[in-house]
């Protein structure tokens, strides 16, 4: 070949390399906040759905149906079921002892505390895990971290768009239009999804993703045992953030006698300094979780069809499992 031909071949090779890079960067990742979704499935599907031995499987079947619908509607390239290896990490409890304290069923000295969970849901969790494993859907939980932290780390490392499916508003903090990170929040069980992007956050709360951390800790969250700042509700928190920018700006205003804080706001914020100092670390999801090396590609065929067939028969997974398998294969 003449010199020009070699140059053309080299250019073509470079273009192909660029195309491969672009393809890798645009893979759509879907992250499931698994526990929040199977809780919703449990309460959204009648308890009359049973296995042959009488065990309830409403959460299992509801979750499988939900995943099938998610895959069909959003077509992710990669899918991870993120798990709570520790639903109440010690490092968060050390900072705010009330964190999720009301949900502790039993304290465990050398491990995660046992969480209160409905009697007919608890036996379904191992079934959910076994079915996900047999399907080949990546399931990731990391010791000493919540699923939120696993999600935050996966989202932070992603090179393409990310859909986070969760019933936990705390994950609104990860919304980032520039990086294509959005939250799909289930309404009315798991039947309808609210697409949460920056425009929705600003319209609803007046903040962006990172600003939601400041809003949440000021407002507090009884469901997580976060006290918030007394007298500072959601609307007041949003107004303060609009006026002073962020939490640091609000606390600087407490020390500035010329600021436009009301006397009662100044007093309550001043009295809450200890809480405000530690709450960001509790509310903000970790982005540095040591994730295992797993294949996150959406499976087209089950990893263990024999085990899956046995699970389907034992637990009466019937149409729910078949619908998911059909969706994965199309």
Where are these regions (language model features)?
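N-terminal non-cleavable signal-anchor helices
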Residues: 13-16, 23, 166, 255
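Ubiquitous "structural anchor" signal
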Residues: 12-14, 52, 241
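Noncatalytic, basic helical substrate-engagement surface that gates or grips nucleic-acid strands
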Residues: 23-165, 169-191, 197, 276-278, ...
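Non-catalytic nucleic-acid-binding/docking modules located in mid-to-C-terminal regions
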Residues: 20-26, 75-80, 137, 178, ...
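N-terminal amphipathic/basic-hydrophobic helices that include classical n-h-c signal peptides
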Residues: 1-21
């Amino acid at each position: 070949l003449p010199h020009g031909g070699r140059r053309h071949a080299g250019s073509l090779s470079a273009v192909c390399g660029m195309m491969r890079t672009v393809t890798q960067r645009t893979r759509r990742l879907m992250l499931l906040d698994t526990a929040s979704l199977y809780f919703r499935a449990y309460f959204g599907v009648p308890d009359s759905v049973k296995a042959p031995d009488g065990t309830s499987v409403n959460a299992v079947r509801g979750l499988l149906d939900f995943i099938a619908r998610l895959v069909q509607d959003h077509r992710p390239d990669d899918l991870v079921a993120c798990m709570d290896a520790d639903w109440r990490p010690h490092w968060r409890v050390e900072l705010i002892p009330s964190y999720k304290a009301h949900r502790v069923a039993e304290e465990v000295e050398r491990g995660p505390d046992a969480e209160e969970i409905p009697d007919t849901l608890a036996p379904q969790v191992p079934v959910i895990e076994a079915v996900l494993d047999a399907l080949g859907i990546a399931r990731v939980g990391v010791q000493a971290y919540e699923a939120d932290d696993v999600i935050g780390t996966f989202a932070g490392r992603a090179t393409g768009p990310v859909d986070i499916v969760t019933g936990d508003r705390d994950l609104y903090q990860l919304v980032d239009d520039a990086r294509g990170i959005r939250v799909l929040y289930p309404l009315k069980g798991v039947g309808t999804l609210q697409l949460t992007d920056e425009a929705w956050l600003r319209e609803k709360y007046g903040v962006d993703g990172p600003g939601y951390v400041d809003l949440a800790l000021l407002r507090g969250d009884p469901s997580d045992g976060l006290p918030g700042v007394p007298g500072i509700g959601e609307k007041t928190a949003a107004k303060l953030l609009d006026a002073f920018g962020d939490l640091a700006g609000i606390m600087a205003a407490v020390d500035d006698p010329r600021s436009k804080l009301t006397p009662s706001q100044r007093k309550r914020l001043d009295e809450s300094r200890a809480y405000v100092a530690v709450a960001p670390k509790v509310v903000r999801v970790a982005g540095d979780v040591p994730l295992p090396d797993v294949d996150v590609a959406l499976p087209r065929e089950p990893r263990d069809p024999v085990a899956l067939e046995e699970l389907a028969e034992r637990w009466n997974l019937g149409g729910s499992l078949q619908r998911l398998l059909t969706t994965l294969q199309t």
